[in-house]
Swiss-Prot record:
Similarity field: Belongs to the ATP-dependent AMP-binding enzyme family.
The protein's enzyme class: ligase
Positions bound to ATP: T178, G179, G180, T181, T182, G183, F184, P185, K186, D419, R434, K525
UniProt KW Ligase keyword: yes
Chain spans, region Disordered: 525-550
Name of the protein in question: Medium/long-chain-fatty-acid--CoA/3-oxocholest-4-en-26-oate--CoA ligase
Gene that specifies this protein: fadD19
């Protein structure tokens, strides 16, 4: 008997509806829904046979490839909880994550074997290890690792998990570990039903209404040809997990690639006739734009939607993409691991605004003032984004942070991760940025994303982050850490004159550091700790003499 709104059930409804349809494509490999089911069932049975219990944690330490989706589905079919592992983590971070998540099993790519070998002695609960071949020759047998397909080959391909006491529920837990901008990663715990509703396609984004029946998406899949969807951020990011599960539940075809290569993205869109491209802000959009400006001979006639989420997407880049790709829809959405989808905007030519994204929020997202009241449209009051309704249970093993982020105000429980915004007169919301990285200069609160967007509009700036640095007069002033385009080195005076047309004078950077590359997460998230370290490690390359003391 199917249990409504469990992720495994929702996937199986689509598998039953379109078994022979291609579910996944990666390079020259592809898998139908029936093949995905068979391999995921084998993995689930193998994990159960290895002693992985209901609710146990299984790590996924892989780039985007077919095996990571097999593993995602197989882990959930086994009644376990998948743990996303950032493949850029060093050994100390891996040890923390393995330990904090109570991980008992791990699926990892072979290239990470040395790191895994060094971490396992300190994390003895990780006993079952499956290794995905990736062309590397690292030794994984020294710690008992077993090749992925060899391990599952003799396991049952049957869908008989209820008989194995792996009952499913809408209350089963799904965990997203956040990279965050400060501190160690935290595991955000969601009920399956809640994360399905706000992140995995259980709401009609056009109407804001819930999908009524658990079979509706599968029925629609059987009645319509598939869309070809291409999420390019790594699967460690909630945005790509969201795009992938939405594709699976609705019987679409998902294209994956282990590495982000802008030229290859456009070739893949052309070769695979991709319809929808998903990415995370400027860190991906700018290289994509540069590649397209260099070579615009790709056949992109199939592509009709470019969707960015969860990272700064600068107006200047939106405008140029619209110029090069006319008659496409470009969307810019807000959301987080703690809230799911929060709102979106559709960008048209000439409509890109300065500052943070201006979005239409969904009816479960509000902006609250300091007293916990909803901010009135056009009031000019800065408030904080809050989400009600289907929100997480809390952070795994962190009651203090749970109490700080998930609050009950006037009898309503909200998720409040710390993003500030203003409500415009027409009811749309302009995002200002995360409060934890805001800069206080002379009593004025400055949000980095607005300044970064202005800087990145300059033709000589490839990427930039801004942070606050000590100032004897103002307490802090805005400092820019800039990666210029090759052969360029814009002065602070040039940047000052350029950005003043987009932002107020008190927000303009007063000191400047040049770097070869701005450090970001694999999904393009800014690393403000790293940026702050750059300003502390050496003197600025340029300062505004009128505003910064020598």
């Amino acid at each position: 008997m199917a249990v409504a709104l469990n992720i495994a059930d929702l996937a199986e409804h689509a598998i039953d509806a379109v078994p022979d349809r291609v579910a996944l494509i990666c390079g020259d490999e592809q898998l139908t829904y029936a093949q995905l089911e068979e391999k995921a069932n084998r993995l689930a049975h193998h994990l159960i046979d290895q002693g992985v219990g209901k609710g146990d944690k299984v790590g996924l330490y892989c780039r985007n490839r077919i095996e990571i989706v097999i593993a995602m589905l197989g882990i959930i079919k086994a009644g376990a909880i998948l743990i996303n592992v950032n493949f850029r983590y060093v050994e100390g971070e891996l040890k923390y994550l393995f330990d904090n998540s109570d991980m008992v099993a791990l699926v990892h790519e072979r290239q990470y074997a040395d790191r895994v070998a060094n971490v396992l002695p300190d994390t003895p609960n990780v006993k079952t290890i499956l290794v995905v071949q990736d062309g590397s020759d690292k030794d994984y047998r020294r710690y008992g690792g077993v090749e992925f397909y060899s391990a599952i080959a003799d396991s049952s391909p049957e869908r008989d998990f209820a008989e194995l006491q792996r009952e499913r529920s809408a209350d089963d837990i799904y965990i997203l570990y956040t990279g965050g901008t400060t501190g160690f990663p935290k595991g955000v715990m969601w009920r399956h039903e809640d994360i399905y509703r706000v992140l995995f396609g259980g709401t009609d984004f056009a109407t804001g209404e819930f999908i009524k029946d658990e079979y509706d998406l599968a029925k629609a899949a059987a009645a319509n040809p598939p869309m070809i969807r291409y999420p390019i951020p790594p699967m460690i990011h909630g945005a790509t997990q969201s795009a992938t599960w939405m594709s699976i539940f609705s019987g679409q075809t998902t294209v994956l690639a282990p590495e982000f290569d802008a030229d290859q993205v456009w070739r893949t869109i052309s070769d695979r006739k991709v319809n929808l491209l998903f990415f995370t802000g400027d860190a991906m959009a700018r290289p994509l734009l540069d590649a397209l400006m260099k070579d615009n001979d790709y056949d992109l006639s199939s592509l009709f939607l470019l969707a960015s989420t969860a990272a700064l997407f600068s107006p200047s880049i939106k405008e140029k993409l619209l110029e090069l790709l006319p008659n496409r829809v470009i969307t810019d959405s807000i959301g987080s691991s703690e809230t799911g989808f929060g709102g979106t905007s559709i960008v048209g030519a000439g409509q890109a605004t300065t500052g943070g994204p201006r979005v239409t929020i969904d009816h479960r997202t509000v902006v609250l003032d300091e007293e916990g009241n909803e901010v009135k449209p056009g009031s000019g009051v800065r408030g904080i984004i809050a989400k009600k309704g289907n929100i997480p249970v809390g952070y795994y093993k962190d009651e203090k942070k749970t109490a700080e982020t998930f609050k009950t105000i006037n009898g309503v429980r909200y998720a409040i991760p710390g993003d500030y915004a203003m409500v415009e007169a027409d009811g749309t919301v302009t995002m200002l940025g995360r409060g934890s990285v805001s800069i206080n200069s002379g009593g004025e609160k400055i949000y980095p994303e607005e300044v970064e967007a202005a800087l990145k509009g300059h033709p000589d700036v490839f990427d930039a982050l801004v942070v606050g640095v000590p100032d004897p007069r103002y307490g802090q002033h805005v400092a820019a850490v800039v990666a210029p385009r090759p052969g360029s080195r814009p002065s602070l005076a040039e940047l000052d004159g350029f950005v003043r047309s987009a932002i107020a004078g008190y927000k303009v950077p007063r000191s400047l550091w040049f770097v070869d590359e701005v450090k970001r997460s694999p999904a393009g998230k800014p690393d403000y700790r790293w940026a702050k370290e750059q300003t502390e490690a050496r003197p600025a390359d340029d300062v505004h003499a009128a505003h910064v003391s020598a």
